[in-house]
UniProtKB/Swiss-Prot annotation:
Disulfide bonds: none annotated. Residues 21-31 have a biased composition (Gly residues). The keyword S-adenosyl-L-methionine does not apply. It comes from Moorella thermoacetica (strain ATCC 39073 / JCM 9320). Residues 1-58 are annotated as: Disordered. This is Large ribosomal subunit protein uL15. The keyword Ribonucleoprotein applies. The gene is rplO. GO terms for cellular component: cytosolic large ribosomal subunit.
Amino acid sequence: MRLHELHPAPGSRPRATRVGRGIGSGLGKTSGRGHKGQKARSGGGVRRGFEGGQMPLTRRLPKRGFTNIFARKLVPINVGELERFEPETVVTPELLHDAGLVKQARDGVKILGDGELTKKLTVKVQAASRKAIEKIEAAGGKVEVM
């Protein structure tokens, strides 16, 4: 079997309906577009969200909030993912990147508390949740927030 020999099973793909090919086809004359009107014309139809001239919903609702340009973009990592490291390891953002847990460090790494940790690790990161710190310290490790 070669790629050029592959074909769909007979009857699995319906034939393309050709419109505008005479009244016997069932889709002749107006080609399923009805009579006249904006939607019957070529390029016709209204844009997404258009409500016939009524003020659209997206413009009726108020704007809210803003984007804080100073927000730190921290990459979240769960405690359970640190289980792959050997005991007594010093876990840093660079080590997490080398291990493939973090693709791009951005403004740093934040350790979150999901999962279990049994190994004693020293974790040096930009931020950690209270639950994550408790789990790391319960396993005998320590957290240093840089």
